[in-house]
Amino acid sequence: NGMAVAEFLESHPKVAYVNYCGLESSPYHALAEKYLPNGSCGVVSFGLAGGREAASIFMKNLKLAAIETHVADARTCCLNPASSTHRQMNDEQLKAAGVPAELVRMSCGLESSEDLIADIAQALDKI
């Protein structure tokens, strides 16, 4: 599921970047192929064009993914650090800490990839 979601996100115009070592565009792709011959994990991080506000709108409109502060479960979990674990920081402080305001971390669960992508697509449409 992680690869399917990462590929969808990489092609979406409202997504600024995708961090997933399974993607050929990743600077870590060669290492992933060497050390993870059976594929990577289901954790995908990505940045939304539009910053903190776009990430907040996206998160509020997800229906399938659970909004959690952790990203390890059989179900899909999603987190925007700027609006949860790091919410006390302003954008400058987030940048200094290496946590972009637009960052979303998604741990893809066992749901069907088609259902996950449909949920992500409808949430992105709300931005």
Locations of regions flagged by a protein language model:
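Conserved small-domain helix->loop->beta segment predominantly found in fold-type I
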Residues: 3-63, 69-74, 89-95
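PLP-dependent enzyme catalytic core of the Aspartate aminotransferase-like
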Residues: 60, 76-127
